[in-house]
């Protein structure tokens, strides 16, 4: 299993915790990682990626590119540290907890989960909360989050 973390910013990241979160989700969901690249970037880079690949001209918390289907996972995901910071303030969760949540969310996308409908978002949110608890990261109130 290859999990590579890439930080394109100057902000220090809890790399061991992030890798642990990726491994936890894969293990609990029955996934096997062939190769996962996690790229942590700033808002400008994320906006460019979001515009180029998805046609959305704004920053977002994560963009995921699965290169396989099913439980054998190969792919990459990008996480905007700027958006993580804004969400941490918005949801009163703290930066590290929000970073772990978005990382977990990204891995769930690589495993085929979607969040296009309220039901799908709710299912993903429950899984995120569960994995955050297992990691000892706590869970902020999900009331406002359910609107997103």
UniProtKB/Swiss-Prot annotation:
Q: What is its main location?
A: cytoplasm
Q: What is its EC number?
A: 3.1.-.-
An annotated Gene Ontology molecular function:
zinc ion binding
Which residues are Zn(2+)-binding?
105, 109, 115
List, alphabetically, the SUPFAM superfamilies matched.
Metalloproteases ('zincins'), catalytic domain
Coiled coil region boundaries: none
What cofactors does this protein use?
Zn(2+)
InterPro entries named in the record: MetalPrtase_cat_dom_sf_prd, YbeY, YbeY_CS
Q: Where does it reside?
A: Cytoplasm
**Cited NCBIfam families:** rRNA maturation RNase YbeY
Instruction: Give the UniProt family note.
Output: Belongs to the endoribonuclease YbeY family.
Q: Please explain the role this protein plays, according to its UniProt record.
A: Single strand-specific metallo-endoribonuclease involved in late-stage 70S ribosome quality control and in maturation of the 3' terminus of the 16S rRNA.
Report what the protein is called: Endoribonuclease YbeY
Q: Which species is this UniProt entry from?
A: Chlorobium phaeovibrioides (strain DSM 265 / 1930)
Q: What is the lineage of its organism?
A: Bacteria, Pseudomonadati, Chlorobiota, Chlorobiia, Chlorobiales
What's the encoding gene here? ybeY
């Amino acid at each position: 299993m290859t999990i590579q973390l890439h930080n394109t910013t100057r902000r220090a990241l809890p790399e061991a915790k992030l890798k642990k979160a990726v491994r936890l989700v894969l293990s609990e969901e029955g996934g096997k990682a062939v190769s996962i690249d996690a790229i942590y970037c700033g808002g400008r880079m994320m906006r460019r990626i979001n515009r180029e690949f998805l046609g959305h001209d704004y920053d977002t918390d994560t963009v995921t590119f699965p290169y396989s289907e099913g439980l054998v996972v190969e792919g990459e995901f990008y996480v905007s540290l700027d958006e993580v910071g804004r969400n941490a303030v918005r949801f009163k969760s703290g930066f590290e907890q929000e970073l772990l949540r978005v990382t977990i969310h990204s891995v769930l996308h690589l495993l085929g989960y979607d969040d296009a409908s309220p039901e799908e978002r709710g299912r993903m949110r429950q899984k995120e909360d569960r994995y955050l608890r297992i990691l000892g990261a706590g869970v902020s109130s999900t009331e406002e989050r359910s609107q997103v």
